[in-house]
């Protein structure tokens, strides 16, 4: 399973990259706003650091505007930039046009398997089901991922699933067990993945034994 990091914070991206845990990056307008920096400056920094898919989201709500923004964004790195487009009727129109031109689209804000199916039919390279937000309203977000995987396998879609809105290591574990292609994970959850209480106990014991043996 590939790990993407879900952030626009360049320091977090660097830290995760140094651990070998960044196969790609996903951003959105909210994450960029948290940095207090211009979107274009953030994007330039990420492109220089990461050699992998980098999702940059459009803010237009009409297909024509989405396509125009997409054509500007891919200039930052024609190979690695992936255009993030929301799951709407206009988004499907834009995705169809961009996909025909060879532009990879990550269709975001997916909340149902049927939305994922429509995105795949439009030519999206990736779909991003938001599992945490579904959990928030009483649904099992990861169950939806399993259903999307089944549909894509049934019909031979090449579209990859990016498990998004990840809130805990449990989401990552279930994604791995289900066979999801990618998890995009916030930095704090990535750090949680590195930890286990027994690991800390083991380190303390090893250090204590070593110290005692050297006296």
From Swiss-Prot:
Protein's cellular compartments: Cytoplasm
MF annotations from Gene Ontology: aldehyde-lyase activity; transaldolase activity
Enzyme Commission no: 2.2.1.2
InterPro entries named in the record: Aldolase_TIM (IPR013785), TAL/FSA (IPR001585), Transaldolase_3B (IPR022999), Transaldolase_3B/F6P_aldolase (IPR004731), Transaldolase_AS (IPR018225), TSA/FSA_arc/bac (IPR033919)
Major subcellular location class: cytoplasm
Keywords, in A-Z order: Cytoplasm, Pentose shunt, Schiff base, Transferase
Substrates-to-products reaction catalysed: D-sedoheptulose 7-phosphate + D-glyceraldehyde 3-phosphate = D-erythrose 4-phosphate + beta-D-fructose 6-phosphate
SUPFAM superfamilies reported in the protein's UniProt record: Aldolase
Signal peptide: none
Pathway: Carbohydrate degradation; pentose phosphate pathway; D-glyceraldehyde 3-phosphate and beta-D-fructose 6-phosphate from D-ribose 5-phosphate and D-xylulose 5-phosphate (non-oxidative stage): step 2/3
Any single biological process term in GO: carbohydrate metabolic process
GO CC terms of this entry: cytoplasm
Active site: residue positions: 84
Function per UniProt: Transaldolase is important for the balance of metabolites in the pentose-phosphate pathway.
HAMAP family recorded: Transaldolase_3b (MF_00494)
NCBIfam families given in the database record: fsa_talC_mipB
Family recorded in the similarity comment: Belongs to the transaldolase family. Type 3B subfamily.
UniProt-recorded name of the protein: Probable transaldolase
Gene it is expressed from: tal
């Amino acid at each position: 399973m590939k790990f993407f990091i879900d952030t626009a914070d360049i320091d977090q991206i660097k830290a995760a990259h140094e651990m070998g845990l960044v196969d790609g990056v996903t951003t959105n307008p909210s994450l960029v706003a948290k940095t207090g920096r211009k979107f274009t400056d953030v994007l330039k920094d990420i492109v220089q650091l990461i050699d992998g898919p980098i999702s940059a989201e459009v803010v237009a709500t009409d297909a024509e505007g989405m396509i125009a923004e997409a054509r500007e964004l891919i200039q930052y790195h024609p190979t690695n930039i992936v255009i993030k487009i929301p799951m709407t009727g206009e988004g499907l129109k834009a995705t169809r046009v961009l996909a025909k031109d060879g532009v990879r689209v990550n269709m975001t804000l997916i909340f149902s398997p049927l939305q994922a199916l429509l995105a795949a039919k439009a030519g999206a390279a990736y779909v991003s089901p938001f599992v945490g937000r579904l959990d928030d309203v009483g649904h099992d977000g990861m169950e939806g991922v399993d259903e999307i995987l089944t549909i894509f396998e049934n019909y031979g879609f090449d579209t990859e699933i990016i498990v998004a809105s990840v809130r805990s290591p449990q989401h990552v574990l279930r994604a791995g067990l289900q066979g999801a292609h990618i998890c995009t994970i916030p930095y704090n959850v990535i750090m949680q993945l590195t930890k286990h209480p027994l690991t800390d106990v083991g380190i303390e014991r090893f250090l204590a034994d070593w110290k005692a043996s050297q006296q």
